[in-house]
Curated annotation (Swiss-Prot):
Name of the molecule in the record: Lipoprotein signal peptidase
Enzyme class: hydrolase
UniProt keyword terms in alphabetical order: Aspartyl protease, Cell inner membrane, Cell membrane, Hydrolase, Membrane, Protease, Transmembrane, Transmembrane helix
Organism from which the protein derives: Halothermothrix orenii (strain H 168 / OCM 544 / DSM 9562)
Active site: D109, D123
Gene Ontology terms: cellular component: plasma membrane
Length: 145
């Protein structure tokens, strides 16, 4: 089941990124809701928020390690729908950005809320998955008390 979540995230992420790359120029910004939400094509050569630019291979290694730990965790705790969903979202998002790093040397970002650095669907998937996993772990801790 986790692989279905991973596959859906990767497919959606890569399809949107392909459209952005085909239809927009780098740094082009299209207002969807003026001064609130734009589609802005950014080539992010760093990590989140563009930090540590040019560390492509470091990010590839970190991503592979994190995915490995998540898969181990998933297989040890299999059975919970929340674990399946959360790990699937994190792994799918991580793989979506990993594909970009390997293919292009950068990650394609495009969601621009004007008050936050530009990000993408894969980033959103990782954040939502991490939040769900933290919530699950917190609930498990409360049940164990």
């Amino acid at each position: 089941m986790v692989y279905i979540v991973v596959l859906i995230v990767i497919l959606l992420d890569q399809m949107v990124k392909l459209l952005v790359m085909e239809k927009m120029k780098v740094s082009e910004s299209i207002p969807i809701i003026k001064d609130v939400f734009h589609l802005t094509y950014v080539q992010n050569r760093g990590a989140a928020f563009g930090i540590l630019p040019g560390r492509r291979y470091l990010f590839i290694v970190i991503t592979v390690v994190v995915i490995s730990f998540l898969l181990i965790y998933y297989y040890k705790t299999r059975g919970s729908g929340m674990v399946t969903l959360s790990t699937g979202l994190i792994i799918g998002g991580a793989l979506g950005n990993l594909i970009d790093r390997i293919r292009f040397g950068y990650v394609v970002d495009y969601l621009d809320f004007r008050i936050w650095p530009v990000f993408n669907l894969a980033d959103s998937s990782v954040v939502i998955g991490a939040a769900l996993l933290i919530l699950y772990l917190w609930q498990q801790e409360k049940v164990g008390d």
